[in-house]
Regions:
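Conserved pre-ATP/AMP-binding loop-to-beta segment of ANL
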Residues: 14, 120-137, 144, 167-173
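Conserved AMP-binding/adenylate-forming
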Residues: 23, 38-81, 380
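Conserved AMP-binding A3 loop
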Residues: 26-28, 133-160
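Conserved AMP-binding/adenylation subdomain of ANL enzymes
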Residues: 156-173, 181-218, 232-233
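Gly/Ser/Thr-rich phosphate-binding loop
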Residues: 216-221, 230-290, 302
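Conserved beta-loop-beta connector loops within the AMP-binding
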Residues: 290-291, 304-322, 341, 359-360, ...
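Conserved ATP/PPi-binding loop(s) of AMP-dependent carboxylate-activating enzymes
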Residues: 296-300, 311-342, 362, 381
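AMP-binding/adenylate-forming catalytic core of the ANL superfamily
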Residues: 325, 330-331, 354-439, 449, ...
Length: 466
């Protein structure tokens, strides 16, 4: 089966199948425009695409996939150093560029212009499922971004698993305003509709009023988006006609979950994944959705929770989540050392995330092992639990909890809070009344904003560097 099976097979020429902002293409127009791009690639093995939120990005990515090239999305906000690293490290042979794209510099490969007015009906052979589809660059805490190599098979396995879990069909209309250089926005949010056959409405910047006006059956968002929608009741109520509200890329705070459920009539559906693994765990459309849980493994995916020595842990015990299955990446490009560090001797991928699994199989992500598992005075404290307790205070708008050095305890619980008229001592006492005493923050720092990346994830390393 073709990776973009519905797009490859359709004869549907009705307007508006794929809409980005106020511009759209029918299925047939998209296929013919992307095929014209594929014709221009002349057998290039790797092609870079400036991944703006635009129809040009959709056509460029699809054109590269039709041609059998590995597509390298370049974040539009990447600085010169990051951009040059991605282009050099990926070995991109061509750069697809839309009108208005900044002029290429010495580090750029030859430019192929993207012209959405061109059409072609040529048929390109379907590449081997094991062939690379995407090279997505992901940043760690140190060093330059690493290119995660994702095969066509892995993407297909992920999307088919999600179609099963979410009852995702051609009758759906998907709306979101996510960046198109990450798994969430590009793989799930663009390639998903092209494989399933559902219509796509990318709203541009993810403002609540744009989500409210989209009239979709499915919505994708990160917690920051959902928090802003929940803060605008009229926008949230406009989503009552939807079928699924999907949240990912970070944990959805329980107060936001509750607010959305009350305003929209829908309990949000959470899922879990990484660039390296794609989505591996998700709540199901026909299953129970509980705040703080991300569901069960997708078909073909296995998970386990292990201790610091790699030993298996029982249900409800907190440890590192490891996964295996058909959605996993092929490795880091040019970095066998980094790739080897993520694999166990028996073939499991080390996510670096701390999790628990309930007796019924529901997964709960506590956070990153490096930043969200706090070891204080012999206790293991999950940062997310303390964050949820802080967010239950009416004066707290945002909260991030980290472990910081303590001369006696090893680490202490330190909270960074964005709030209105709250005091440090008040918040410490509030948490102590709701959680075990050892989980209360020893220090609360009131800040104007929390540092976030393009996907809305709090960058905790920047908090502790400040």
């Amino acid at each position: 089966m073709s990776l973009l099976s519905r797009l490859a097979e359709t004869t549907d020429d009705r307007p508006g199948a794929v809409r980005v902002g106020d511009r759209s293409l029918s299925w047939v127009e998209l296929r013919r425009a992307a095929t014209a791009v594929a014709d221009d690639l002349r057998g290039a093995a790797r092609v870079a695409v400036p991944a703006t939120a635009s129809l040009e990005t959709v056509v460029g990515v699809v054109g590269g996939l039709l041609a059998g090239a590995a597509v390298v999305p370049v974040p539009p906000d990447a600085g010169p150093m990051e951009r040059n690293h991605i282009l050099r490290d990926s070995g991109a042979e061509l750069l697809l560029a839309a009108p208005g794209t900044p002029d290429a510099d010495a580090a750029s490969p030859p430019v192929v212009p993207l012209d959405l007015a061109r059409r072609s009906d040529r048929r390109h052979p379907e590449p081997d499922p094991a062939a690379t589809a995407l090279i997505l660059y992901t940043s760690g805490t140190t060093g330059a971004p690493k290119g995660a190599v994702l095969s066509r098979h892995a993407i297909a396995a992920c999307l088919d698993g999600l179609a099963d879990a979410w009852a995702w069909t051609p009758d759906d209309v998907l709306a979101h305003g996510l960046p198109l250089f990450h798994v969430h926005g590009l793989v799930l949010g663009v390639l998903g509709p092209l494989r399933v056959g559902s219509r796509l409405r990318h709203v541009g910047r993810p403002h609540p009023e744009r989500y409210a006006a989209a009239g979709a059956s499915m919505y994708f968002g990160v917690p920051t988006i959902w928090s802003r929608i929940a803060a605008q009741p009229a926008a949230a109520r406009a989503l009552r006609g939807a079928r699924l509200l999907v949240s990912g890329s970070a944990a959805l705070p329980e107060p936001v979950f509750a607010a959305l459920a009350g305003l929209t009539g829908h309990r949000p559906l959470e899922r879990y994944g990484m660039t390296e693994t794609l989505v591996t765990v998700s709540a199901r459309a026909d299953g129970v959705r509980r705040p703080g849980t991300v569901g069960v493994p997708l078909p073909g995916v296995r998970t386990r929770v292990v201790d610091e020595h790699g030993g298996p842990l029982p249900a409800d015990a907190m440890g590192e989540l490891q996964v295996r299955g058909g959605t996993l990446f092929d490795g880091y490009l040019n970095r066998p050392d980094a790739d080897a560090a993520t694999r166990t001797a028996d073939g499991w991928f080390r996510t670096g995330d701390v999790a628990t699994v309930d007796p019924d199989g529901a997964h709960r992500i506590v956070g990153r092992a490096a930043t969200d598992l706090i070891k204080s005075g012999g206790y293991r404290i999950g940062a997310g639990e303390v964050e949820d307790a802080l967010l239950a205070h009416p004066g707290v708008r945002e909260a991030a909890v980290v472990g910081t050095p303590h001369p006696d305890l090893g680490q202490q619980v330190t909270a960074y809070v964005v709030g209105d008229g709250v005091a440090e001592a008040e918040l410490i006492d509030f948490v102590a009344r709701h959680l075990s005493a050892h989980k209360r923050p020893r220090q609360v720092r009131l800040v104007g904003a929390l540092p976030r990346n393009a996907m809305g994830k709090v960058q905790k390393s920047r908090l502790t560097e400040a």
